[in-house]
Amino acid sequence: MKISEEEVRHVATLSKLAFSEEETSQFATTLTKIVDMVELLNEVDTEGVAITTTMADRKNVMRPDLAQAGTNREDLFKNVPEKENNFIKVPAILEDGGDA
């Protein structure tokens, strides 16, 4: 399945990324190769093959889920240069507000 440069540009726009024409072309080629490989893997007959979810022998190795007291909010806000309604106020990083 061929991934077109237009599709790459569309996804880049949605992701708020900017690519040169050369990069767009390279991404289209690379993504086409990846999709082709996945399609090839989909053709492999896995009938009768046991499902493998991990190669590790361990299962459900987790620490106990115990509640711990966190740092006091007032202490955290002592180092904050600017706050608003109990939130840390930071400079905007998207010019148009970030609407997709």
Swiss-Prot record:
Its EC number is 6.3.5.-. One of its GO terms (biological process) is regulation of translational fidelity. It comes from the Bacteria. Keywords: ATP-binding, Ligase, Nucleotide-binding, Protein biosynthesis. One of its GO terms (molecular function) is ATP binding. SUPFAM superfamilies: Glu-tRNAGln amidotransferase C subunit. Pfam families: GatC. InterPro entries: Asp/Glu-ADT_sf_sub_c, GatC. It catalyses: L-glutamyl-tRNA(Gln) + L-glutamine + ATP + H2O = L-glutaminyl-tRNA(Gln) + L-glutamate + ADP + phosphate + H(+); L-aspartyl-tRNA(Asn) + L-glutamine + ATP + H2O = L-asparaginyl-tRNA(Asn) + L-glutamate + ADP + phosphate + 2 H(+). The keyword 4Fe-4S does not apply. Heterotrimer of A, B and C subunits. Allows the formation of correctly charged Asn-tRNA(Asn) or Gln-tRNA(Gln) through the transamidation of misacylated Asp-tRNA(Asn) or Glu-tRNA(Gln) in organisms which lack either or both of asparaginyl-tRNA or glutaminyl-tRNA synthetases. The reaction takes place in the presence of glutamine and ATP through an activated phospho-Asp-tRNA(Asn) or phospho-Glu-tRNA(Gln). Belongs to the GatC family. NCBIfam families: gatC. This is Aspartyl/glutamyl-tRNA(Asn/Gln) amidotransferase subunit C. It comes from Streptococcus uberis (strain ATCC BAA-854 / 0140J). The lineage of its organism: Bacteria, Bacillati, Bacillota, Bacilli, Lactobacillales.
